[in-house]
Amino acid sequence: HTPDMVQGAILAFRAASNARDVNCVVFTGAGDKAFCTGGNTKEYAEYYAGNPQEYKQYMRLFNDMVTGILLCDKPVINRVNGMRIGGGQEIGMACDFSIAADTARFGQAGPKHGSAPDGGSTDFLHLFVGITRAMASCTLCEHWSAHAAVDIGLVNKIVPVLKAPDGRFIGNPMVSLERFDAWGNPAYGAFKSGTEREAAKAAMAGCTTDLSLLDAEVEAMAYKLSLTMPDCLAKTLESVRKKKLEHWQRN
């Protein structure tokens, strides 16, 4: 994300809150590679990091966007079209619902790339996955597959986006669907390695990406939300979001 993008998002969420013809907000990224992989580290290294006040300004802008999502009067669906990493993970968690491509990846990057995950993950990631997983994610920066993310409660649903040459949708072959490893540790959604990984890469070689099923699931969620009473829905969103806001406002 860049300052221009963040400023635009802040204004967009405010406008959506006030628009009577808006049923819900869908927050997504362009293309099929990533929803968001965090801040432009080159940008703030060159422009912001030389002055503490400038870095504070940079982070305040991002924080205002997260707050804008949490206070939006309309439900917010995160359409995860690819990687949701770093600041992207934090933006996504601020949303009310997450529907993801099964090729998406989730996690943090801060301690490995010169920052800290203080834009939401240190505040409320544990509300989704528990303090043990949250600590590991924030410090080790190891990523979850989309399958692991839905299994641990980080997202609502995943859908296939890879299309084989014969036109069939196939599930992401890069992840294991085994529930446990040889020692009994949870392993659902673990990334394959070694020869299994090479075989999975070969299976993907002839595939194309088609996001039509992802769009259909997002549309279905939006339709379900449209069947609720707007005022009652807004009050319910406000009440459930209090749990995230309680932790976020300590930031």
Predicted regions and their residues:
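Conserved CoA-thioester-binding segment of acyl-CoA-metabolizing enzymes
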Residues: 1-28, 53, 212
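Terminal peptide-recognition signature
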Residues: 8-9, 27, 40, 75, ...
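Catalytic-core regions built around general acid/base machinery
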Residues: 12, 61-73
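Crotonase-fold acyl-CoA enzyme core
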Residues: 68-230
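A general structural signal for well-ordered alpha-helical segments in protein cores
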Residues: 6, 62, 122, 215, ...
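Short alpha-helical scaffolding segments that buttress acidic/His motifs in well-ordered protein cores
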Residues: 137-138, 236-240, 251
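Hydrophobic alpha-helical membrane-association signature
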Residues: 5-9, 58-61, 91, 214-217
